[in-house]
Structure formats: structure tokens, C-alpha cells
């Protein structure tokens, strides 16, 4: 999947790309690629991760909240709230640290991957 995330100034597109990065990280933890995002969170690989993580239950809840927001944005055309980006970045960072520990990324590779989500959103284009 190799999802890269970078703020473009389009909140909907930025949010969907951030969710794709989270989804890729779940796959790298061992969740089946062909599953839905919800099924990936319920997969044995995700459950093993939650059980091994000190904040596992809270992290699971936060990821489900992100999935619910994603569904509302995609299916109900809900607006993307500003908190979604900081929450998504934090969740992606925690998942990335887990896949680094499992050897799927080197520290340098992981740092490069997280440099994009840490970048601020570009300014909106000037009105014509």
C-alpha cells in the first residue's frame, strides 16, 4: 500500500490519506489487506497488538473513534473536525513505533514517514 501522508489544505483529502496511513500500519502489524478497516481493527494481529501495548484498550477505543469519523465523513458527508488530524497523527505515530519494533521499518525510515504528518497544513490558495 505504501501510503504517504502530507497536508495539502484539502481537509477531506488530508483526512482520508491519514486514515489510509493508519490502515497500512494495521496491515504491517499483520491485519489482512483485503479486510475492511473495521475488520482490520478486529483482526487477531490488531488484538495481539492491543494486548501487548500498555495503553491497548484506550488505543483501541481511539482507533474505533477514528473509524467512526471516517465512516461519517465518507457516507454522511460530515465535516472533518480539526481534532481529527492531531488524533490521527498520534495514532499513526503509535502504530509506526509498533511496526518499527517488529522490524518493518528502521528508525530512519519511520522518522521519515512521520515527518510528513508532522508538517503543518499549507495556507489556503488565494481567492481569485
Question: What is each of the regions a protein language model found here?
Answer:
Residues 1-68, 72-126:
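Amphipathic alpha-helical interface elements
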